[in-house]
Amino acid sequence: MLGLKEKICLYGFNNLTKTLSFNIYDICYAKTEREKEDYIKYIDEQYNSERLTKILCDVTEMIGAHVLNISKQDYEPQGASVNVLITEEALPVALIDPSCNKGELSYLELRDSVVGHLDKSHLTVHTYPEFHPNNDIISFRVDIDVSTCGKISPLNALDYLIGSFDSDVITIDYRVRGFTRDVDGRKCYIDHDIKSIQDYIDEETLKKYDAMDVNVYQSNIFHTKMMLKDIGLNNYLFNSDPYELSPNDRREIRDRISKEMIEIYGGVNIY
């Protein structure tokens, strides 16, 4: 959980904006055109707007916020987007803008209590399937942004987000912007202790990944990259059994998947 060793008594509303940008990459080996098409269809169905909405609503609950409005869309030929407007405190229905749907979907209950509207607090998710006809490696990227103002922090949902997707490579950015004031009028540019994003990820999860930080502490910018250590071919072959392949083929495919992950992890073409 977030917090300072010594609590700061703030004057008025906490104006700090905390933004978490979370990108995961799922890698797959698909040799034939049919396998590529089937994988894209599978991913498109597996991570459609309905499921993504459920994930964002779970995140909203985990960080202690409340849904004001949801907009979602599935795209053709593939991809999906969801945007959720949230509030730190639940609003009485009479105070909610009539254009907001209050997240009234089949798996949500309408909450009606207390006050406080944070119109810059939101969650968004977009999906990006990617493949090339000359390449047997397919990737699928999920881009999630969680932006909050007030006391709530998006860092509390990191483990859930990592576990919600097949996360082979992960890039996470966290920044704090704006300032708030204490009761003496002194500006405060961050309201919690943080040395690394990794501090908010479960140790058992971190053991599965190689991780690296690039932080700019004086600017309240934190960046973590993670790459899965174990490449088990059964998790990367789509509709194929690795034991039906020769040892040389398995070695070659594992090597190609590893190179693809290293390039995505480093953000540069190497091989």
Swiss-Prot record:
Looking at its record, which EC class is this enzyme? lyase
GO cellular component terms? cytosol
Q: Example GO molecular function term?
A: adenosylmethionine decarboxylase activity
Q: Which residues form the active site?
A: 121, 126, 149
List the pathway annotation: Amine and polyamine biosynthesis; S-adenosylmethioninamine biosynthesis; S-adenosylmethioninamine from S-adenosyl-L-methionine: step 1/1
Give the residue range of the signal peptide: none
| Cofactor binding mode and count | Binds 1 pyruvoyl group covalently per subunit.
Could you tell me what reaction this enzyme catalyses?
A: S-adenosyl-L-methionine + H(+) = S-adenosyl 3-(methylsulfanyl)propylamine + CO2
Q: In its keyword annotation, does this UniProt entry include Amino-acid biosynthesis?
A: no
**EC number annotated for this UniProt entry:** 4.1.1.50
Protein family membership: Belongs to the prokaryotic AdoMetDC family. Type 2 subfamily.
Q: How does it assemble?
A: Heterooctamer of four alpha and four beta chains arranged as a tetramer of alpha/beta heterodimers.
Name the chain's protein.
Answer: S-adenosylmethionine decarboxylase proenzyme
Instruction: Please give the organism.
Output: Clostridium perfringens (strain SM101 / Type A)
